[in-house]
Amino acid sequence: MTTHEQIINYTIKPHGGTLINRVVEGEERDHLLEAAQSYKVITLNPWSISDLELIGIGGFSPLTGFMGVADYTKVVEDTHLENGLVWSIPITLPVTEEEADKLEIGDDIALYGEDGELYGTLKLEEKYTYDKKKEAQNVYGTTDEAHPGVKKVYDKGNVYLAGPIQLINRPKHDEFSDFHLDPAETRQLFHDLGWKTVVGFQTRNPVHRAHEYIQKSALEIVDGLLLNPLVGETKSDDIPANVRMESYQAILKNYFPKDRARLVIYPAAMRYAGPREAILHATVRKNYGCTHFIVGRDHAGVGDYYGTYEAQELISQFEDELDIQILKFEHAFYCEKCGNMATAKTCPHDASEHVHLSGTKVREKLRNGESLPTKFSRPEVAEVLIKGLKQN
């Protein structure tokens, strides 16, 4: 008989060995809902709500709450938690000094969203100030306020609250409900499908021919693909999640074997932290049950802040500790002479034969209602994107 533990560990053990679950249900939830009415209250922005959800469902295992100063300092300075596990991005709960002054260590705090919904609770164990410039420099590699992630750091409250959380209500992802699975559920799915090896693919962009080529190359060596697009907060000029989700369905339906790929949302905010975020993305996909993770060119990058393969170089230093196999791919393109997709590793021809289209150029063309070259994008995908952006 297959036990719950065998299913959870079917492909790979979670980061730290245990899949965290801070979701309260049934009578416990009813009691907590009632008790929370008398708790002190703080309101979380969408970024913090998505972090709360990912802690609660185990996506951020082994974290059981927002980081205290020891973990925070170790992560910022050394890319590890205090217990020695690799962790690359601080998961923190910022508040203003005025809010912090009203709270005392030991307080139970009700965590509300900007929509007025009660999402969870925090047992306050610590409150501490932090150096914004140091966090920006170490995590994002720059103190430039034009960087969207750095700007978020500078705009945050000056105090971090720390302590274990409980997740009472989940953020609603209604339009993506068919694709909303928690790490325990994806692990069950992989067990049911018989996938012993699974490659995770992170994206905040539509999947074009270059991505498809990389995913299919990976599928040659593993049992299944988890297409795991980020649907939390992104930059205003990124293509909206609902449009992207429709495009992912189009490409999977028309160009992938039905028993080899699954689409599941990743309900996180995008930090644009490049190399450091690549490590977080790999860690989270390990928690979702992936044994392999794809890191391509300029992973989680923005503008010209990071080198083309800087994320691959950094994550390579931690690959043994992460215990998930990193598949590093070069920039893929369509080669006119080869007559197919290729990379510099497989194509001998001059760059003049290569068809590249940057994400910026794609967005520009789509917003102008222009069609995308079939060498760059599948027609079914282009059609969804043009229609979706007109509606948005």
Swiss-Prot record:
PANTHER family: PTHR43509, SULFATE ADENYLYLTRANSFERASE. The keyword Ubl conjugation does not apply. One of its GO terms (biological process) is sulfate assimilation. It comes from the Bacteria. Keywords: ATP-binding, Nucleotide-binding, Nucleotidyltransferase, Transferase. Belongs to the sulfate adenylyltransferase family. It is an enzyme of class 2 (transferase). This is Sulfate adenylyltransferase. One of its GO terms (molecular function) is ATP binding. Pathway: Sulfur metabolism; hydrogen sulfide biosynthesis; sulfite from sulfate: step 1/3. Its EC number is 2.7.7.4. It catalyses: sulfate + ATP + H(+) = adenosine 5'-phosphosulfate + diphosphate. The keyword Nucleotide-binding applies.
